[in-house]
Regions:
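Exposed substrate/partner-binding surface patches
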Residues: 1-229
Length: 229
């Protein structure tokens, strides 16, 4: 699902915006076959959501005034948990539709370039990790949420500066923000995120992992032998 960021304070507002109906009337009437032009309502309704929900935040879009593509760095908040029941048809609302955040894909940079990395919570009760190229490091909730909302930030030292300072604090625009979110339905969490054992891996992947392990062992031995001389 592609959700608007511009003009939206948070993920919930983006969902309400997505299902908002549009009136087709006046010069914009709907052409109904056999009935000609008719006043109508145009909109989207959700009958259900998948076990794993991928939400693309529209950080890149075409600016009519500038006649060019731009990156939207506006602040847009997203939660660790969201109840999507209000956005479903009435018939589906007897089920629980709470979703938990388990993945954040981030772009750091501008329209013309930048860097991509991911923040992932691999298990229901695990910590968060940052996957940045070949580096995997633990991540805090601040790194997952606040650091990727976009908008502006107070520069380092701005909050704790000396009381006698009189110059105004200038906020800095953030160019690092989330562009895709991955939520997992809470009631299906154990099934979606169940542990993967050796039997679940395809042969080609098991062989590749073993080859990489052997190569790492060879390089380790070579380094140890070099130290002997």
């Amino acid at each position: 699902i592609q959700l608007n960021v511009k003009g939206m304070l948070n993920l919930e507002q983006s969902f309400w915006n997505y299902i908002q109906t549009e009136m087709l009337e006046g010069d914009n009437k709907y052409h109904a076959e056999g009935y000609g032009l008719q006043d109508a309502e145009k909109g989207v309704v959700f009958e259900k959501f998948p076990p794993v929900l991928h939400l693309q935040l529209k950080r890149f879009e075409y600016d009519l005034e500038k006649d060019m593509m731009v990156k939207i760095n506006d602040r847009h908040e997203f939660p660790l948990s969201i109840d999507l029941k209000p956005f479903l048809i009435q018939e589906a609302q007897h089920e629980p539709w709470v979703y938990k955040l388990h993945g954040v894909l981030v772009h750091s940079g501008d329209l013309h370039g930048g860097h991509y990395f991911a923040l992932i919570k691999p298990e229901p009760d695990s910590n968060w990790f940052k996957f940045d190229d070949d580096r995997v490091t633990p991540a805090t909730l601040k790194e997952v949420l606040e650091d990727n909302f976009g908008g502006e930030m107070v520069p380092p030292g701005g909050i704790n500066r000396h009381p006698s300072a009189t110059a105004p604090i200038r906020a800095m625009k953030r160019f690092t923000n989330a562009y895709m979110l991955v939520y997992v339905r809470e009631s299906l969490m154990d099934e979606v995120l169940k542990p993967i054992g050796p039997a679940d891996l395809p042969d080609y992947l098991s062989e590749r992992i073993e080859d990489e392990r052997i190569q790492m062992e060879i390089r380790r031995r070579e380094r140890e032998e070099q130290h002997l001389y």
